[in-house]
Amino acid sequence: MATVAPPADQATDLLQKLSLDSPAKASEIPEPNKKTAVYQYGGVDVHGQVPSYDRSLTPMLPSDAADPSVCYVPNPYNPYQYYNVYGSGQEWTDYPAYTNPEGVDMNSGIYGENGTVVYPQGYGYAAYPYSPATSPAPQLGGEGQLYGAQQYQYPNYFPNSGPYASSVATPTQPDLSANKPAGVKTLPADSNNVASAAGITKGSNGSAPVKPTNQATLNTSSNLYGMGAPGGGLAAGYQDPRYAYEGYYAPVPWHDGSKYSDVQRPVSGSGVASSYSKSSTVPSSRNQNYRSNSHYTSVHQPSSVTGYGTAQGYYNRMYQNKLYGQYGSTGRSALGYGSSGYDSRTNGRGWAATDNKYRSWGRGNSYYYGNENNVDGLNELNRGPRAKGTKNQKGNLDDSLEVKEQTGESNVTEVGEADNTCVVPDREQYNKEDFPVDYANAMFFIIKSYSEDDVHKSIKYNVWASTPNGNKKLAAAYQEAQQKAGGCPIFLFFSVNASGQFVGLAEMTGPVDFNTNVEYWQQDKWTGSFPLKWHIVKDVPNSLLKHITLENNENKPVTNSRDTQEVKLEQGLKIVKIFKEHSSKTCILDDFSFYEVRQKTILEKKAKQTQKQVSEEKVTDEKKESATAESASKESPAAVQTSSDVKVAENGSVAKPVTGDVVANGC
């Protein structure tokens, strides 16, 4: 049996082995720096010991890991979003909400096929492998292929190796002249002519309301959002400029560039606030150029480090989108940047739809232009200028004249001349107080028009033409109404497609003439016509009629009807009563002069198109005649007499006629 040492001896032995003195260090280098980093995370050493870590070390900055003399090639694949904490793009409609506080130039491009979200590198400035002069912790090289707003892709850019030269003078960005099409008027870049926040003057009187910008005055310090020093707060009444009016994040405060119309936005060195307009003004005018886009694909364009350069527009009211321009509206391609993200040109057209009220729903997104195959050259408007909230006739004529300028037409009709020549119907003959609303027998139909241009012609000439099936349906209804004793009027409720309203009520006063075509309509596809008389001309919103359902149309609201949809007597009388009692402040008569100018433009274009077709047909006929004569001259000189049984050969001998099985040898 082993002898056990007494407890006193054990304690003495332990005290001899223990030592409270710290071992001498070989050098002043901290212990963590001596350790190998191969198995630093999750690994163990050969003895099975878990390595210890010193959490008091200073974290390594990107500038410590990046050698300024080495070229860092950008990664062609976009990594996962890791700026989510700071409000970077997490949705299709998001942009990073923060910008580099030193005011480094922003990018103005989109990422290519590999990108799944909008991913500008850093906090709002372009991908750049070198450190700006004022950045204490610069970002590393760009990690995604950045493409510009063109229809082609730029190749990768490989910058020259070498440190960033802060002593290089920043060139002053010159003013660029706008590429203005011929005949297009441009608002002068004069601050005195900028409209106030209450409205913009239009014509001689009246004002069109605009959306206020609520842009507060920014702090003049070099930091962002007015917080130059730690603890700095925002001014009273300040609205976060990172959010645009459409709910999208903006990489820089939303600003107004109307004072710099059609020129490049200047960049000054007085601070961030000097790059933005401090007044509440209307959005920028058309055809505004910002700067050359030569810095795509990780190329940083030199600019002032104390002020922001401007970026090309993406979303409406975020950067001042151009109504039309060289590169179209790039960022509007379904809010995704895949194969459809490069120069979408607004579904193949160079005009962007900035006002949904003037969009031709289902017929293109342009403001004045629609289908290029349309002979008229003007798209179909579902609502006229009165939708802007002004009833100034002279202002409407200005809009009409602008249409002709945009389409390349000569400005022949002046405002004064149009006032004298335009014949607006007398308003007293419509919306009469004694118009009856109760009928024992009556028939009602819904009429859907493609545009208000055709409704204008109908009121002007008291005529209408429907589709072939619609004309047959109305013709049968008119014959049936004529056979009823005591009379049976046929009322037509007119509505324009996608307008959200009805424009009036008319009565059919004659049969359909299938053999008479009128040349009034915007398109030449309508055949036949019938006379009518307008009783009520006013704008009646659909919201007043949605409660009326039609049993003969699957109990759908009357506002969801097709052309020549019949309405029963009970529902029809309710609609007539609503039409009469509704007090409307606008009607199509307010835009009558506007549509008069459009009608003249359409007729001129039709005449030119017809003349062009006639000249082309004439040239084609002349070419055919010359080709026939040339082919006849190339034929053999032998003359063949077909009206006789005697054939004259080239040598003058006579060939006897062939009879039966006898062969004529011509001897």
Curated annotation (Swiss-Prot):
Main subcellular localisation: cytoplasm
Ribonucleoprotein found in the keyword field: no
Binding, RNA: K448, S449, Y450, D454, W464, A465, N497, W521, W526, W534
Effect of W534A: Abolishes binding to N6-methyladenosine (m6A)-containing RNAs
Annotated YTH domain residues: 442-579
Record note on quaternary structure: Interacts (via C-terminus) with CIPK1.
Protein name per the record: YTH domain-containing protein ECT2
